[in-house]
Curated annotation (Swiss-Prot):
GO terms for biological process: protein O-linked glycosylation; regulation of Notch signaling pathway. It comes from Caenorhabditis elegans. Residues 277-339 are annotated as: Catalytic subdomain B. The lineage of its organism: Eukaryota, Metazoa, Ecdysozoa, Nematoda, Chromadorea. The gene is gly-8. Substrate binds at residues 147, 180, 204, 308, 339, 344. This is Probable N-acetylgalactosaminyltransferase 8.
Length: 421
């Protein structure tokens, strides 16, 4: 706990200092990438322009509207993002000992990005960062799959123009679904377009740090049935400041609510623990690497799920119970914009998060199913659809039961649920 408090103080102090320094700089020029893509792509990094991209004094009417539109549409400040520009080097965010690590995994890699109602500036900055900070020998392609964005937010034409300007037609696979698939099914459809040996699923508002990919590939070489996670750093939704986050495992409670599990200070006093991958009971879901062949072997995501929610729990359980593992690679760092809220809608008339969670519970919890419904009683009466396919995967892979998972992977899950206390 002391480690978390001390690091948080340093991070906060650094942000305050950076903000104070930025306030002394003039307001950045605003170039709108939707209207002038070439001009926006020509913008130099902030370090060269010497301006403040977050300053809200003396905004023009167009700038004010852009800021308000961004917060309403994306739950982050699109004006700050556009003024930040197309390129940013967030530097080396991992522990200094990571610089000494040697990696020899050489899988061709496809980065798979699903976007629905996404801001153009964030996705283009992410693509530029992936291209710049990934070895050419490893990056096979980036799959950009647009899941039926609403009319004002369709990016496919902008992305095609970007690919032509940058000469990336052979590196970017740009596809659009005219009908809303939802994040889960869209990920499956997009992954089927990928031709790399490894797929990296990445949310559409991320930025990679230097040497982000190599640490993700090495554990896969050591165990091909690995799902490998980076450390997810924080990008502020208003200022877009990049801040390193605590190294942590991922977990969940009996209601499948995700949570971070922070490692004790003493763990990191052993130098090698700052660099070596470690097991995690679960995953956040937005950022992960695995062999495409293994993803298919696991039955991909459950195509009976709707929109978003619990797919991370399902994939975690499938990996652990069916002969694989989930690990965190602390030397891999990827920043993620943590938005103010989830700005897109679910399926009308349906609690999709609960629906998906019930499907996972019915498929994987077995004798522990009652613990889930004690936390989520509304789910007990919910119609959850056909489970034939996920059950066939479970049988085909001869998966272990939930008791094994608790005893061998996640003993912290065993305490009684609230209504039994």
């Amino acid at each position: 706990m002391r480690r978390h408090v001390v690091l948080s103080i340093f991070v906060f102090a650094g942000i305050v200092f950076a903000a104070e320094e930025a306030e002394k700089l003039p307001k950045c020029e605003h170039v709108d990438p939707y209207e002038n893509l070439e001009g926006w792509l020509d913008l130099k990094p902030l370090t060269e322009r010497k301006c403040n991209h977050t300053l809200k004094e003396n905004l023009t009417e167009a700038e004010s509207k852009k800021s308000e539109w961004g917060i309403k549409s994306f739950a982050f400040d699109a004006l700050s993002s556009e003024k930040l520009g197309p390129n940013r080097n967030v530097g080396k965010q991992a522990h200094k000992l990571c610089e000494e690590e040697k990696y020899d995994a050489s899988y061709s890699t496809s980065v798979v990005v699903i976007h629905h109602n996404e801001a153009l500036s964030t996705i283009l900055r992410m693509i530029n960062g992936i291209i710049e900070f990934t070895p050419k020998s490893l990056l096979k392609e980036i799959v950009l799959y647009e899941d039926a964005s609403e009319e004002d937010h369709v990016l496919t034409k902008h992305l095609e123009k970007f690919a032509k300007i940058k000469g990336l037609e052979d590196k970017l696979i740009i596809k659009r679904s005219e009908y809303r698939q939802g994040l889960i099914r869209a990920k499956v459809h997009a992954s089927r377009l990928a031709t790399g040996e490894v797929i990296v699923f990445m949310d559409s508002h991320c930025e990679v740090a230097e040497r982000w990919l190599e640490p993700l590939l090495q554990p896969i070489k050591e165990d091909p049935k690995s799902i490998v996670l980076p450390v997810v750093d924080l990008i502020n939704p208003v200022s877009f400041d990049y801040s390193p986050s605590m190294v942590a495992k991922s977990g969940f409670d009996w209601g499948f609510t995700f949570k971070w599990i922070y490692l004790p200070w003493e763990y990191f006093e052993t130098p090698e623990n700052n660099v070596k991958p470690f097991n995690s009971p679960a995953m956040p879901g937005g950022l992960l690497a695995m062999r495409k062949e293994y993803f298919v072997e696991l039955g991909e995501y459950d195509m009976g799920m709707e929109i978003w929610g619990s797919e991370n729990i399902e994939l975690s359980l499938k990996a652990w119970l069916c002969g694989g593992r989930v690990v965190v690679a602390p030397c891999s760092r990827v920043g993620h914009v943590f938005r103010m809220r989830r700005p897109y809608t679910s399926k009308p008339g349906m609690d999709t998060a609960l629906y998906n969670a019930v499907r996972v519970a019915k498929t994987w919890l077995g004798e522990y199913e009652s613990k889930f419904f004690a936390v989520k009683p509304r789910g007990a009466k919910m119609v959850f659809g056909d489970l034939t396919e996920p059950m066939q995967v479970k049988d085909r892979l001869k998966c272990k039961d939930m008791k094994w998972f608790i005893e061998n992977v996640y003993p912290e899950l065993e305490p009684k649920v609230h209504d039994e206390l």
